[in-house]
Each structure stands twice: as C-alpha cells, then as structure tokens.
Amino acid sequence: MAREWPMEQSPTLQAHLALQNADADCAAVIEALADAARELARQIAIAPLAGFDEGAATVNADGDVQKALDIVADNLMRDALRKAPVAGILSEEVDRPETVNAAAPLCVAIDPLDGSSNLQNNISVGTIFSIRPRGRDVLSSFFEPGTAQRAAGFFVYGPQTCLVLAIDHRVDLYVLHPTLREFVLARSGLRIPQDTPEFAINASNRRHWSGTVRNYVDECLAGAAGPRGRDFNMRWIASLVAEAYRILMRGGVFLYPADSRPGYREGRLRLVYEAHPMALIMEWAGGSASSGRSRILELSARSPHQRAPLIMGDVRLVRDVDQLHEGVEPLFETSDAPLFARRGLFR
C-alpha cells in the first residue's frame, strides 16, 4: 500500500532521491527534466493567451500535426537534458536521435508533450520519458528491450502538476508545490489497486478492431448477466498520461490495440518513449503491460519511432486479454471466421 506524506513532512524530489541513494546520474537527469517541466507547466497555463494551443502548420518526424506548444516543450526538454549526463536524446518531435555527449552514461527517450491535441479542451496533457544506459552508440541504445531501462516516468499537467517516477523498482508520486515551486513527495510505493472492474478503450474504433478485442469488450459490456459475471465501467480520456494516472490510483485496464486502419496495424503508440516507460511504471507498481501477445518490456524497437499496441493495468485484467489472443492468428481475425467466431475468455 502506498504511503501518503503530509505536506509538512514531504521531502523534495531532490532530497528524496538522495535519501533513497538513487544513482547520481539518473538523479541528475530526473532533476533536469523536473526543471523543464516546471517551466512547461507555466507555459501550458497561459497557452490560450499566448496562442500556444494553436497548430504550428508543421508535422513532426512521425507525421503528427504539431501544436506550437509541442515545439516549445521539445525545446525546453532537450535544452534541459543537454546540461545533464546524457549521451543522446530521442524525441518524438525529431526524426533521429540527437547526440549530446557520446561519453555520457545515459540516453533519454521522450515524448515532450503527449496529448497536445487536448490543449484546446483543457484536458490533462503530459511528458513521458525513458532513461536507459548508453549502448555501443547512441542509436543502438534505443533499440534495447524495455527491460534495459534504468528509470521512467511521466509528468501530468492538469489540476495539479505531478510527476510519477519509476526508479529502483518502486513508483513514487510527486506534486509541484505552488508556493515552493518544487516537486514534493506525495505518495511513495504506489501499487495498482486490484480487481477494479473498469476498462478504457476508444469504442468509436470498434469496426476496426480484431475479433478478439471486440469479443473482450463485448464481454465487459454484458455486465453481471454476461460471461464475466460483473458490471464494468468504461473510461476514455484520450490522454495517455491521464489514463495511466487513473490506473495507478483506481486500477482497471487500458487498451490501445492494433487495428485494421492504415498506420494502426502495428499499434499506434510509440514503443520506445510511450509503451516502454509506461510498461516499466506498471510493472514496478505491481501491474502488467502487454501487446496482447508479448510482454512490452521484452520488445525491442527496430526503428526510433516504431509503434506498438499497449494493454496495461491490473495484472489479472491484462492477463484476460492476453488469454483471448492465445491460439488466434495475428492480427486481424474477423469475428465471423469459423475458428474464432466467438472466442471469449469464458467459452
């Protein structure tokens, strides 16, 4: 069970990392990211006044339309990381990794502003990062499996500005104190609540899903009268950091599967700087993360911006989805195919 820290006893991020004897290089990178996140939180707060929530008429390395604040966030994060012990940086906003100091011990993969399309709707957005050891060269460092990560985390810019940090096999929550302007420890040792009957998926894409995913969602929607024997709530925020935060606080399962649309057949989220860090956080908080067929942390990227499906959350609920995929040919079996017509977990 997570320990809650009263405000008057809460150590700062820097102090807590020192108390936990965190690796000095990792700590320096995390503190650099926190410095950038403080400024980014301020920029997000004034985005409608400064026009930062508008499009920048450009696309990033992966073909996504950029907001002006995407570029601001990328510059803030990379500028901060250049002052830390970092050999290379892989950002969602650039095509290839940037070499900073080839002799430094760490590399960082980052999505500087995840969910920026939500800015105009005043929905939480965030920064996701993965810290990993430098390999034989900067590029190859990002092609190691997710198990190689030294630390990972995400900032949430919402009602509070928070940092969820996975380091040394634990997950802690820090909140940006509005007066001190420091991240202070709010909860340590986060554990995902078990057996919460909630699932998150974008149901508008149902027609594009595999038969397996449709069958899983149908079983949840059938409720207490269906094969799963209980009522489920469905959630969808369309913000990866907000979805992950909710799972850490409430439990349940999040699904962003591959589907039949062009550009989605291998999943939509990026493996190195979205799925890998989220998987590390989930596992170290007692949960699980899968592609539906494989443990996310065991997957290795073949290209910097490779995509992957992501199912994460409560171990039991993730396992349920994995079991539905067993014996099913990848990847878009149809629900009216004879062998898989009504493959369900309970029949």
From Swiss-Prot:
One of its GO terms (cellular component) is cytosol. Its cofactor is Mg(2+). The keyword Ion transport does not apply. Its main location: cytoplasm. Its EC number is 3.1.3.11. Mg(2+) 1 binds at E92, D111, L113. InterPro entries: FBPase_C_dom, FBPase_class-1, FBPase_N, FBPtase, Fructose_bisphosphatase_AS. Binds 2 magnesium ions per subunit. Coiled coil: none annotated. GO terms for biological process: fructose 1,6-bisphosphate metabolic process; fructose 6-phosphate metabolic process; fructose metabolic process; gluconeogenesis; reductive pentose-phosphate cycle; sucrose biosynthetic process. GO terms for molecular function: fructose 1,6-bisphosphate 1-phosphatase activity; magnesium ion binding. It catalyses: beta-D-fructose 1,6-bisphosphate + H2O = beta-D-fructose 6-phosphate + phosphate. Pathway: Carbohydrate biosynthesis; Calvin cycle. Keywords: Calvin cycle, Carbohydrate metabolism, Cytoplasm, Hydrolase, Magnesium, Metal-binding. It is an enzyme of class 3 (hydrolase). It is found in: Cytoplasm. Signal peptide: none annotated. Mg(2+) 2 binds at D111, D114, E274. Homotetramer. HAMAP family: FBPase_class1 (MF_01855). NCBIfam families: PRK09293.1-4. PANTHER family: FRUCTOSE-1,6-BISPHOSPHATASE-RELATED, SEDOHEPTULOSE-1,7-BISPHOSPHATASE, CHLOROPLASTIC. Belongs to the FBPase class 1 family. This is Fructose-1,6-bisphosphatase class 1 2. The gene is fbp2.
